[in-house]
Each structure stands twice: as structure tokens, then as C-alpha cells.
């Protein structure tokens, strides 16, 4: 996996959850914060990552 932030600049509006990758193979955090597992160093710590399967609907927000 790689950071999709470049592909989806408005990922926070396109995805249902904001996925924060603190490190590789991190475990999911409680609450609405979901951590994407297997993120590479390309994301950088604290970078927002998201897979298309985590997106709520199409790549473009319906609103």
C-alpha cells in the first residue's frame, strides 16, 4: 500500500473515515479513527492514508 493522499487531496470528504498511519502494520485505534494497515514510509508518520474500499461511495463526494 502507498499513501493515496496525492491521488485524493480531498480524501477527508471522500472517505467515511480519516485513516491515520502512524507506522507500518499499526493496529486500529478505537472511536471513529481507523488505521490503515501496511502503510509504507512513503505516507510518513501522521499522514492520512485511505484505500478505495474505505471510501464512502465514489471517488467524488455526492454533496
From Swiss-Prot:
Gene3D superfamilies named in the record: CD59
GO molecular function: toxin activity
Function according to Swiss-Prot or TrEMBL: Blocks both the muscle-twitch response to nerve stimulation and the response to exogenous acetylcholine.
Record's protein name: Short neurotoxin 2
UniProt family annotation: Belongs to the three-finger toxin family. Short-chain subfamily. Orphan group XVIII sub-subfamily.
Principal subcellular localization: secreted
One Gene Ontology CC term in the entry: extracellular region
Comment field (misc): In contrast to other snake toxins the action of this toxin is reversible.
Statement: the UniProt record of this protein carries the keyword Transmembrane: no
UniProt subcellular location: Secreted
Tissue: Expressed by the venom gland.
Keywords associated with the record: Disulfide bond, Neurotoxin, Postsynaptic neurotoxin, Secreted, Toxin
Taxonomic classification: Eukaryota, Metazoa, Chordata, Craniata, Vertebrata
